[in-house]
Amino acid sequence: MKTFLTEQQIKVLVLRAKGLKQSEIARILKTTRANVSILEKRALEKIEKARNTLLLWEQINSKVSVSVKAGEDIFTIPDRLFKEADKAGVKVPYSTAEIIAFLVEHAPIEDRLAKRDFVIFLDSKNRLRISECLINFVEEGIGND
């Protein structure tokens, strides 16, 4: 199977998942603890990039999305999501209360306000998702040539 991880990175992650310390892994792999640390750090960075890439792909293929600006009251977001869904002819399978509960749990919210810009979207499997504003620059540039 193709992955972004090297064979050594996979070995380190497997052994760490089993609870081994970096020094123990270094002994098993006949390398230094510092090298194990670097392998683990780079593997985790690759995993984070892969997750972000998948989230971006899901956002690109989303049925409906709403950009939320820092400082915006989360109680305005469900109505905006429903309006965008109506424009797209999509039924949102969540109530206002469920959307607000999702935002409180998953979005960067403090005291009802967005702490930073983010996007809430309904993915192709009708799941609510939160993403950073990763594709706005592309959308803003469309038609401006």
From Swiss-Prot:
This is Putative transcriptional regulatory protein PYRAB13000. Keywords: DNA-binding, Transcription, Transcription regulation. It comes from the Archaea. HAMAP family: HTH_type_Tfx. GO terms for molecular function: DNA binding; DNA-binding transcription factor activity. Coiled coil: none annotated. Putative transcriptional regulator. Belongs to the Tfx family. One of its GO terms (biological process) is DNA-templated transcription initiation.
